[in-house]
Amino acid sequence: LLFTAKIKFMSIIKNHSISVKHIEKSRIDEVDFNHLIFGEDFTDYMFECDFRNGSWGNPTIKPFGNLSISPAAKVFHYGQAVFEGMKAYKDEQGKIWLFRPEDNFNRINKSSKRLAIPEFPKEIFFEALESMLLLDKDWIKPGFGNSLYIRPFVIATESGVSASPSSEYKFMILFSPAQAYYSGDVKVVIAEHFSRSADGGVGAAKAAGNYAAQFYPTNLAKEQGFHQVIWTDSNEHKYLEEAGT
């Protein structure tokens, strides 16, 4: 019962005007939708909004492309970055559906607060999300297992290597067409030495560094023929906490 929350287009009071820079030509014909590799193909548009001088401003939807950012940006040095992940689906009638998008929005702000990142305005988030879904609607394919992966994220962009919270940030949304992540049975192993989080840490936040720390033990598990890890508590490794996806 995933399709319980139909997106309500144009339902947000537009207190903030989002500028749209349109593409010259879609890249959709370059993508093989029958053989997608998760997270490698991206739609025509992306959203970005910058935090400067104490407020979020200049929300823009633009063609997907590279960023220009200082090598001294604090995201590179202190890992001030959080993200979310959710999916949009299209039914056989062409309607687009989301599953509890407000929960994902609330969680990215909760994660941001834990990493001293300013919260993002709800009305801008949903206006941007709705507008992008309309622009990229052809990238959402109907049928079992097909979806559009939605990746909102925030990074610290202030230039400087002092160990302190950034004063500037960039909030972005990317779309990536997706199919089922696993095509068959999934083999898991229970972690006996490594932990995903510790008491008082940032385990409850979707912080970028949490995932980087999982890569090494997950690679060890894959070398042994497993797909993912069941994480245990950090004190005794006796109690199950969560599974990787």
Segments predicted by a language model, with ranges:
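Charged, gly/pro-rich active-site loop segments
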Residues: M132-G143
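Extended, Lys/Arg-enriched charged tracts that mediate electrostatic binding to polyanionic substrates
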Residues: K141-R151, I155
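Helix-start/capping segments and mature chain N-termini
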Residues: M10-M132, G160-T245
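Intrinsically disordered, low-complexity linker/loop segments enriched in Gly/Pro
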Residues: L135, I155-T157
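Short, Lys/Arg-enriched N-terminal segments with co-localized hydrophobic residues
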Residues: L1-F9
